[in-house]
Regions:
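Short N-terminal edge-element motif at the start of the domain
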Residues: 1-9
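Short acidic, Gly/Pro-enriched loop/turn segments at secondary-structure junctions
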Residues: 3, 14-28, 130-143
C-alpha cells in the first residue's frame, strides 16, 4: 500500500542494520508520523533506498531542526524516544512487530537532558559529543572528556536530529527567551 507522507509530517526516524552481511552499515530506516501511527519501512532492497534514507534524514534536520531550536529558546523541551530492550526485543522491531517495543523518553531543554531512566545532565556541563551513525554509541562528554550520558545510536529515534541539536547547543549555548 502506497501512502504519501510529507517530510514535515515525519516525527520519528529509526535507522538500523538488516541482513546478514551489513557490518556496521545502517542500511534500513523506519519512520512514523507520531507515536500513535504505524511505522513505514524503507529496506535496502528498494531501488535507491540509500539515497531515499539520506533525503528523509536531511529533510527532518532541515524541517524539525529550526522548530526544535525555537522550542528550546522558548524554554520548552524536545522529546526523543529510545529503546532499552534486549536484542531479542529489538528483533521484534526489525520484523515489524512494533507493538512489542517499550519506548522511553529523553527530554531535552536548553538547560538539561532528562531520561525516563533517571539520568539528569545539565547542558552547561556538556562540552563535547561523540558518536553518530558510524559509531555504535552517542556520548555526551564534559570538559575533561568524561562521559555524562550515553545512548546506543540504534536505540534512539531521530538520533541525527538529537546529535545536531546537541552540537548546536554546545557551540552556541542557547539563550532562553521569555
Amino acid at each position: 500500500k502506497n501512502k504519501f507522507i510529507p517530510f514535515e509530517g515525519i516525527s520519528d526516524i529509526y535507522r538500523y542494520r538488516s541482513g546478514k552481511y551489513t557490518r556496521k552499515i545502517l542500511n534500513t530506516m523506519a519512520f512514523r508520523e507520531n507515536i500513535d501511527k504505524p511505522w513505514y519501512k524503507i529496506s535496502p532492497n528498494i531501488a535507491h533506498a540509500d539515497r531515499l534514507i539520506e533525503v528523509i534524514k536531511n529533510e527532518q534536520l532541515l524541517f524539525r531542526g529550526p522548530q526544535a531550536l525555537n522550542t528550546l529558546a522558548q524554554d520548552g523541551t524536545v522529546s526523543f524516544s529510545y529503546l532499552t530492550e534486549s536484542k531479542s526485543k529489538i528483533r521484534h522491531f526489525l520484523r515489524g512487530n512494533f507493538l512489542m517495543m517499550n519506548e522511553k523518553k529523553l527530554r531535552l531543554s536548553a538547560r538539561t537532558l532528562d531520561s525516563d531512566d533517571g539520568h539528569h545532565v545539565p547542558i552547561e556541563e556538556v562540552h563535547f559529543i561523540s558518536g553518530g551513525s558510524n559509531s555504535q554509541t552517542i556520548k555526551l562528554l564534559d570538559m575533561h572528556g568524561r562521559a555524562l550520558f550515553s545512548v546506543p545510536y540504534t536505540s534512539l529515534f531521530s538520533a541525527d536530529l538529537f546529535i545536531a541539536l546537541i552540537e548546536h547547543m554546545i557551540q552556541n549555548r542557547i539563550p532562553i527567551r521569555r
